[in-house]
Structure formats: C-alpha cells, structure tokens
C-alpha cells in the first residue's frame, strides 16, 4: 500500500510517501519513496525534496494556501520526474495525518469520517496553534485525492492516554477537570512510541519486559516513562509548554510568575504566554539562539557564559526528569535519546547522563561520540545496570503503519 504521510502546519507541510503492508511491517522492510517539506506556504514557497535515488533538490513555487500545496505535492509525487514509480493519483492508496491533539476522545489512530472531524474540531480550543492546520491538511488531501481515498488521523496525545489518573491530574479543584478537561495530555506521543518500538526491536525484548525513559530532544523536548509498552508519565502537560527546557519554551515554571511578570513588564496574559513559548528556553537564557549546535560552539570556542548556562540548565532539567521517572517505575532498563539534539549532540547526552552514576549508568565516551547523523546503538559501558541508547525517532513510518492498519487491504 502506498501511503502519503502529511504533517501540516500554519505555513509548512512535511511529507513522506511510504510503501507498507502486513508483510513489510513484520519484516521491518517498509520502503520510503520520497520525503521533504514545503515552507512559506502563502507566498513564494520553498520546496525541499529527497528523491528515491537519494538525491536532494530545492525548488520554488507560488502556493497560495495549504490546499494548493497538497495539490502540487500529489501531482509531483505521481509524476515521472519524482522517480517514485507512481503514475496516477489513484496510486496513492491512503493518507496518514499527524494531528497534535485528540483530547480524551481519541486513544488510538482512527480512520477519518464526519464524526472524527467533529471530534478534532472540538479539541481546537486545546490546541489552537496546531489542530486547525491539521484539519486543513485533511481537507486539502480530500480535495486533491477525492473522498474515495481513506484518510487516517494519528494523534500525538493518544499514546499518553494510558497515564494513570494520579499522573495526569493537576492538584487543582477537581471540578475544573470535570467541567473543562484540565489535565496532563502530553505530546510527542508518536515519537515516544516509535522510539520504544525500535528499542524493543534492537534489544529483542518483549513489551512486558521493558522499562525505559525516552528523551525526545529537539527544538521541542519531552521525556516519557514507558513501562510494559505503555506511557505512565510524560513531561509535557495540558500544553507543550510544560516540562523540559526547550529551544524557545521555558518548560516548568511557577504559575504565579505569569501575573508577576505581566504586572512588572506591562504585558497581558496572552503576551506573557507568548513570551514563555517563543522567547524563553535556550534562546531566552543565552540571548543568542535556540539552536543547540550554535550554543555548543559559543560555549566551547568563545567561552560564552550564558551559552554555557543555557546548556547546563537544559541538561539539568532533563536529568531531573530521568531521575523522577526512575523512581516512578522502580528503576529502568535504559535511557533512550532521540530527536535532533538527542541524536546528534554527544556532549549534551554526556552531561545528562553525568549525574546518573548512582543508578548504574556509566557511558563509553568513544561510543557516545560515534553516535551521530542517524546512527543507532548503545553508548553505556558493557554491563551497566542502566543502559544509555541513541534510537532515532521515525514518526512518519509509524503514521504510515497506523494508516495501513486502520484501512487494511480494502483500500488498494
């Protein structure tokens, strides 16, 4: 089955075409035909493509909106120029969509129908920055491919619906949860699920035999405690703002600071929230950038004090969460790193692991340095009681597989 995977944002569209079926999934032999992204939708859009032969291309096109972008994309991936071997729109058998928020309604990936669309619309107030664009992505794919091609919604929050009540509730008046569904939802769920699946494959362990802490570290960051294949706690909360220090997000913060900062700086509550989301984290502390690569260079080569401070705060917060999740699960088999920073910053991994010797985690410096650029493997020492791994996340592959399972062979 040829599956188009879409991740629609406000002015961006990430995509991939994956060939998968039951046999390919069982053998881990799914085929990725093409991937890329379209940026600056609404003007002169920039399109980045990774073709089947491994080559990369960039081009521009005037794409006025998301519908035009999806229509262009479908036309390109079914053209001879793309090299996919697909020659007609009918060769795309299904579309899998990343949807950020599924509320409490969606515990699994689901085939889209009118009821599902209404459910996603009802969660817009929980994810106003993401779900409207995810919905428009579904509508654009329907317009480009017709109602006969099934669409599947894969929710970032679904994996965390297994959190126990004592982990997902906030210690605020209980009626607020009953009336407004104020609770921890967690995000990056598809990524954490992907990491856990791949870790089990690499180690040959069954779901029931695995306790791991997964760290998705990129511009957005989150930690997850996974026991017996299920998420039992996660760092992001009602919104993605809670938890770890991130590229531009503050993470955990005293709630009383919102009013205090607003009063002192003359900012409204939405302005304070915007500051915590887009001007804080690594960027806010360093005053330089939210890019960990640049911060490491500033700290190591130019001895910039605030760059070093931002890195230390980032690693300290992550280490605290790992320690708390080890306590919550009564220990763990491994700490598993993923995401752009987790997969490519050995120094950051080492700093996070540095304070975990008490738990039996000891790293091999040479192995750690070697694991960059998509490499996967263990970098703890032989026999370490708590292992450390790098396992690149593959959300698009998981979305494609969920899409196949949701629609089955009947769509082909």
Curated annotation (Swiss-Prot):
Substrate binds at residue 98. The active site is at residue 156. Mg(2+) binds at residues 7, 395. Pathway: Metabolic intermediate biosynthesis; acetyl-CoA biosynthesis; acetyl-CoA from acetate: step 1/2. GO terms for biological process: acetate metabolic process; acetyl-CoA biosynthetic process. Its EC number is 2.7.2.1. It catalyses: acetate + ATP = acetyl phosphate + ADP. ATP binds at residues 14, 216-220, 291-293, 340-344. Mg(2+). Can also accept Mn(2+). The record marks 188, 249 as: Transition state stabilizer. GO terms for cellular component: cytoplasm. Pfam families: Acetate_kinase. CDD domains: ASKHA_NBD_AcK_PK. It is found in: Cytoplasm. Signal peptide: none annotated. InterPro entries: Ac/propionate_kinase (IPR004372), Aliphatic_acid_kin_short-chain (IPR000890), Aliphatic_acid_kinase_CS (IPR023865), ATPase_NBD (IPR043129). Its cofactor is Mg(2+); Mn(2+). The keyword Cytoplasm applies. Belongs to the acetokinase family. Homodimer. Catalyzes the formation of acetyl phosphate from acetate and ATP. Can also catalyze the reverse reaction. This is Acetate kinase. It comes from Gemmatimonas aurantiaca (strain DSM 14586 / JCM 11422 / NBRC 100505 / T-27).
């Amino acid at each position: 089955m040829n599956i188009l995977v879409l991740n629609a944002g406000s002015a961006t569209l990430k995509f991939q075409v994956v060939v998968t079926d039951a046999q390919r999934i069982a053998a881990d032999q799914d085929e990725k035909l093409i991937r890329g992204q379209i940026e600056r939708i609404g003007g002169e859009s920039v399109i980045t493509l990774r073709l089947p032969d491994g080559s990369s291309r960039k081009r521009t096109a005037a794409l006025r909106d998301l519908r035009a972008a999806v229509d262009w994309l479908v036309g390109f991936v079914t053209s001879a120029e793309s090299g996919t071997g697909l020659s007609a729109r009918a060769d795309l058998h299904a579309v899998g969509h990343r949807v950020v928020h599924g509320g409490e309604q969606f515990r699994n990936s689901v085939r889209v129908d009118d009821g599902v669309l209404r459910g996603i619309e009802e969660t817009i107030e929980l994810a106003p920055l993401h779900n409207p664009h995810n919905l428009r992505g579904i509508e654009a794919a329907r317009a480009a491919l017709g109602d006969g091609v099934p669409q599947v919604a894969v929710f970032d929050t679904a994996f965390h619906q297994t959190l126990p009540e004592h982990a997902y509730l906030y210690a605020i008046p209980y009626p607020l949860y009953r009336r407004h569904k104020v609770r921890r939802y967690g995000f990056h769920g598809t990524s954490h699920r992907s990491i856990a699946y791949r870790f089990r494959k690499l180690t040959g362990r069954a779901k029931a035999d695995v306790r791991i802490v997964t760290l998705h570290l990129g511009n957005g960051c989150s930690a997850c405690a996974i026991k017996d294949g299920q998420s039992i706690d996660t760092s992001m909360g009602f919104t993605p703002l809670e938890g770890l220090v991130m590229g531009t997000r503050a993470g955990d913060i005293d709630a009383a600071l919102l009013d205090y900062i607003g009063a002192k700086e003359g900012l409204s509550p939405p302005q304070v929230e915007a500051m915590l989301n887009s001007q804080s984290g690594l960027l806010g502390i360093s005053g330089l950038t939210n890019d960990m690569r640049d911060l490491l260079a500033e700290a190591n080569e130019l001895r910039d004090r605030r760059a070093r401070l931002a890195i230390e705060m980032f690693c300290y917060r992550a280490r605290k969460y790992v320690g708390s999740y080890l306590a919550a699960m009564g220990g763990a088999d491994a700490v598993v790193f993923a995401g752009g920073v987790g997969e490519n910053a050995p120094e950051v991994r080492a700093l996070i692991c540095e304070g975990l010797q008490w738990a039996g985690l000891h790293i091999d410096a040479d192995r750690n340095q070697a694991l960059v650029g998509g490499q996967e493997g263990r970098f703890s020492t032989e026999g370490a009681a708590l292992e450390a791994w790098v396992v690149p996340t593959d959300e698009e592959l998981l979305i494609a597989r969920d899409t196949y399972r949701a629609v089955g062979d009947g769509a082909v």
